[in-house]
Amino acid sequence: MNYLFTVLLVIEGVVAGYWAIASLFHKERKRKIKWLIFWLGLSSAVWSLGFGVLFAVDSAMIAYLCRCVGMVGVFGYLISILFLLGEVCGAPKKIRTVFEILSFVGVAIYFGTVLPSQSSYYIGRWGMTYSLTSGVIN
């Protein structure tokens, strides 16, 4: 039972990875949308696999590295969603460009959230877990 979250997240990561690759072979989508869906699926896979493995490890340092990988997926997913929504909704090019540029603020936030001082790791009831420390970013 301790590995329930790990198994579920790893399965979701594999499915998202498959979905990402399969999206490239879809014949009816525009080329740009195919690639945006690919990046969305790939980011989701990285997010799920990073946090899925985090629950299974018993070392705080490895858990920290898994969280860093998982957070790459989180921010990649959010950036991909903004790009995809702008494309699908047919927003004017100027508005899309503003939102696309602003979405990369997440990259700066990422580097603030993955600092080792921003979280502490411990073995909980369901496996390794973490808590965030209070600070400007958290």
Predicted regions and their residues:
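Alpha-helical transmembrane segments
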Residues: 17-23
